Amino acid sequence: MARVKGGVVSRKRRKRILKLAKGYYGAKHILFRTAKEQVMNSYYYAYRDRRQKKRDFRKLWITRINAAARMNGLSYSQLMHGLKLAEIEVNRKMLADLAVNDAVAFTALADAAKAKLGK
């Protein structure tokens, strides 16, 4: 039987990795071994940062809500507690959006929270 050298398969594998490494800096988009390492790292970074993104956005929303709440004479925790007592279910993303884009509506929510807190 003739020996099969697998050139087509190897080339296909290398081509796939180098295609994924397109746009990388320096040798990382040219040399197969370094490109392969960088692609593996890139997969790791992507996996990690998909989770990190959720934390980052939550932190951003809380910061924005806190700033707007303090402009209305409440702290973040007081506002959230007051909203819970007033049975107003609005998530942090929506609250942050109101704080940035619709100050009047946010003030109305803050006033409702203040009323339930007895302030």
From Swiss-Prot:
Coiled-coil region(s): none
One GO term (biological process): translation
Keyword terms of this UniProt record: Ribonucleoprotein, Ribosomal protein, RNA-binding, rRNA-binding
Annotated S-S bridges: none
Gene Ontology cellular-component annotations: ribonucleoprotein complex; ribosome
Domain of life (superkingdom): Bacteria
PROSITE patterns referenced in this protein's UniProt entry, alphabetically: RIBOSOMAL_L20
Family: Belongs to the bacterial ribosomal protein bL20 family.
The protein's role, per its UniProt record: Binds directly to 23S ribosomal RNA and is necessary for the in vitro assembly process of the 50S ribosomal subunit. It is not involved in the protein synthesizing functions of that subunit.
Record protein name field: Large ribosomal subunit protein bL20
Organism whose genome encodes this protein: Streptococcus pneumoniae serotype 4 (strain ATCC BAA-334 / TIGR4)
